[in-house]
């Protein structure tokens, strides 16, 4: 099943995001190689600066999705104010549909 990880950064944490980006990208590449990543990218504020992340992953259940989310270097660094994990139904433009 697909799960959306909707992550919101803590206020004034752009530098932490930038500093932690290389291991975060490495983590995403690992998920991709394992077939667990569907898509990912930053959410942006009105000025076009990153303020969070949207990551859609494959997991057996919500607990497995939460365990994967906890492995994100951004999460480990304390970047996120909140992380919402929700089942996701990719209807339009799904290349596997």
At which residue positions do the language-model features occur?
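Conserved, structured core segments of small domains
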Residues: 1-97
């Amino acid at each position: 099943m697909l799960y959306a990880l909707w992550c919101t950064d803590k206020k004034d944490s752009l530098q932490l995001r930038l500093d932690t980006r290389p291991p975060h990208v490495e983590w995403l590449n690992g998920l991709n190689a394992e077939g667990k990543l569907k898509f990912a990218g930053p959410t942006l504020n009105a000025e076009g600066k990153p303020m969070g992340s949207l990551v859609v992953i494959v997991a057996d259940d919500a607990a497995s999705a939460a365990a994967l989310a906890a492995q994100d270097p951004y999460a480990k660094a304390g970047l996120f104010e909140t992380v919402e994990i929700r089942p996701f139904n990719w209807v339009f433009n799904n290349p596997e549909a």
